C-alpha cells in the first residue's frame, strides 16, 4: 500500500513555492521596516500552555489540539497558534519589564476538517507588540496591515474592528445575553448551548443560521461599552477610512479566549466561506494567565495559505537560468 501524506497536510512543490518565497520575503521586509525583530519558538509546547491561554472553552483546546503523552507522561501539543509561545518565551527569559516588537513565521497545527483555505498543518506569520499600552500601537498595527496588503497586491479586502471592553463590560453583556437566549435553548445548536454555559461571548461567533437569526434581535455588545472604547473605535475608523474599507462589527469576538480591548479581522469575499485571512487584537492579561507579572500586549496573525490565494503578484516568468560549467586543464 502506498504511503500517503496525512490528510490536511499537503506537500509544496517548486512551482508552488515561487509565490511562497515572494510572500515570505515581502513579509520579512515589511516587518523589519516597521522596527520588529524575529523570534522563533518550538513547534511543541506543554499542553497546559494552550489550556491556560487559548482557553478550555475554545474549539481549539476541546477538539483541535494535536496532543500526546511523552515518555515521562507529560502532555505536550503541537502549537495551534503563535502568540502564547511568544509570551511564554518572554516570561521564561524574564524580559516582561522590557518593550518588544517581535515577528514570527512558521507551521501551526489544528485537527480541523480540511477544506478550501483550511488545513491541519498550516502556516502563520504574526507580529506581537509587548509592553505597549492601548493607543498608538493599535494604529501602528493597522497601518502595517494596510502596508502589507498594498505590497502583496491585495486590493479587495475589509478590516472589521470591535472592542471587548473590560471585565465588567464582558460580565454584564454575557448575563444579558444568557437571559435573552435561555427561553430559546430548544432552537440553539447543541454546540451553542455548550458555549452559552462555558463562554457566552463565543456565541456571537457561531456559524449556525438559527443562532444568527436569534442574535439579530439580541442585546448588542456595543450597547454595554463605555464611551471611551466607543470613541476609540470611531477615531480608528475615521483615521483609516480614506486608506481602506474599515468598519465596526459589534459581533466580532475572535476565536481565542485571551483577547481584551480592540480586536480586528481582515476579510475578503474572494475567499468564500473562510473569508478571514488576518486577525488579531489586544491581550493584556495573557502573561498573568501564564504565570507572569503582567504585560500589555497586542498583535495579529496572518494565514499564509489564504493570503497566497489572494496575492495578485505572479511569480516571475521566463527567468533566465544560469548554468556553471567547470573548465580545467588536463594534465
Cite the ranges covered by each PLM segment:
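Positively charged, Gly/Ser-enriched RNA/tRNA-binding surfaces
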Residues: 16-36, 45-46, 63, 81-96, ...
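Auxiliary tRNA-acceptor-end handling modules of aminoacyl-tRNA synthetases
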Residues: 1-17
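Acidic, His- and aromatic-enriched active-site or binding-groove loops in soluble protein domains
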Residues: 61-70, 175-204, 268-270
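Short, surface-exposed recognition loops or helix-turn segments adjacent to catalytic cores
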Residues: 156-165, 192-196, 247-253
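Short low-complexity, flexible loop/linker segments enriched in glycine and/or proline
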Residues: 53-57, 173-175, 262-265
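A positional/architectural concept
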Residues: 38, 75-78
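Short, conserved secondary-structure transition motifs
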Residues: 161-175
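Polyanion/phosphate-binding surface patch
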Residues: 43-76
Amino acid at each position: 500500500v502506498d504511503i500517503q501524506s496525512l490528510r490536511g497536510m499537503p506537500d509544496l512543490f517548486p512551482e508552488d513555492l515561487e509565490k511562497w518565497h515572494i510572500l515570505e520575503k515581502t513579509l520579512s521586509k515589511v516587518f523589519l521596516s516597521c522596527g520588529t525583530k524575529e523570534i522563533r519558538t518550538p513547534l511543541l509546547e506543554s499542553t497546559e500552555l494552550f489550556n491556560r491561554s487559548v482557553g478550555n472553552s475554545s474549539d481549539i483546546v476541546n477538539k483541535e489540539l494535536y496532543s500526546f503523552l511523552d515518555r515521562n507522561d507529560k502532555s505536550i501539543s503541537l502549537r495551534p497558534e503563535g502568540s502564547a509561545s511568544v509570551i511564554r518565551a518572554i516570561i521564561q527569559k524574564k524580559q516582561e519589564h522590557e518593550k518588544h516588537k517581535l515577528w514570527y513565521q512558521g507551521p501551526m497545527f489544528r485537527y480541523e476538517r480540511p477544506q478550501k483555505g483550511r488545513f491541519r498543518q498550516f502556516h502563520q506569520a504574526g507580529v506581537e507588540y509587548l509592553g505597549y499600552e492601548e493607543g498608538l500601537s493599535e494604529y501602528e498595527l493597522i497601518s502595517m496591515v494596510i502596508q502589507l496588503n498594498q505590497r502583496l497586491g491585495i486590493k479587495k479586502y475589509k478590516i472589521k474592528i470591535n472592542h471587548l471592553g473590560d471585565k465588567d463590560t464582558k460580565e454584564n453583556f454575557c448575563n444579558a445575553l444568557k437571559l435573552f437566549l435561555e427561553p430559546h435553548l430548544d432552537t440553539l445548536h447543541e454546540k451553542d448551548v455548550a458555549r452559552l454555559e462555558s463562554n457566552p461571548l463565543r456565541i456571537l461567533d457561531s456559524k449556525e443560521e438559527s443562532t444568527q437569526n436569534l442574535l439579530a434581535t439580541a442585546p448588542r455588545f456595543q450597547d454595554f461599552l463605555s464611551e471611551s472604547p466607543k470613541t476609540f473605535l470611531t477615531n480608528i475608523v475615521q483615521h483609516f477610512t480614506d486608506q481602506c474599507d474599515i468598519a465596526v462589527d459589534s459581533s466580532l469576538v475572535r476565536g481565542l479566549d485571551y483577547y481584551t480591548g480592540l480586536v480586528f479581522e481582515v476579510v475578503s469575499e474572494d475567499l468564500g466561506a473562510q473569508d478571514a485571512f488576518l486577525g488579531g487584537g489586544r491581550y493584556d492579561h495573557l502573561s498573568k494567565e501564564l504565570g507572569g507579572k503582567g504585560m500589555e500586549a497586542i498583535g495579529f496573525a496572518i494565514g499564509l495559505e489564504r493570503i497566497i490565494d489572494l496575492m495578485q503578484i505572479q511569480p516571475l516568468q521566463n527567468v533566465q537560468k544560469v548554468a556553471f560549467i567547470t573548465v580545467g586543464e588536463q594534465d
